[in-house]
């Protein structure tokens, strides 16, 4: 019995070593697969994050949780934008003739309320992502491509969107102001397709003054939106 136990000991040691080696190989394979995936996503021009398949989740192991930080922020960001900025841009695009200032102003007022919350929602989502990001313990070969994708997915969209919010609100407020002015003129404002006529030179001057401020505000908004993936000025 003593002889048998001594003989089995090196066998058990060898088996344990083989198990550790297999585990090490598995982690290396997961790193390699995840790095290749990150590089593939980074090379895509549309900036979208693909949903992981069940096979990819298995191949990436715990790195699946690292990727979830990116997808969670992206979903929260897109949801916040689609509930505020996107509808506002749609309303702005429907203003084509002077009478449209009247028909769109109430919807624009509601959109401004949603836009005032957009900054809070995006900042909260970024804080959540940053907190999870700081806790990551990644090997260097994973960290380098992951940091690039984190910057593109989280940092850059946030930095581009936040300055665009006041630009969008200011532009919408100017459009509402024109609509309110036209409403106040009553039947003294006569709409004729792409033009509007007034009874007095003072009305014409005031209307022209309001409209004159729009091109610069519109250009500022367009410039701000260029840095936000998936958001385009209509």
What is each model feature region?
Residues 1-21:
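Sec-dependent bacterial lipoprotein signal peptides
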Residues 23-105:
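Leu/Val/Ala/Ile-rich N-terminal alpha-helices, chiefly Sec-type signal peptides and the beginnings
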Residues 101-197:
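Extended amphipathic alpha-helical interaction segments
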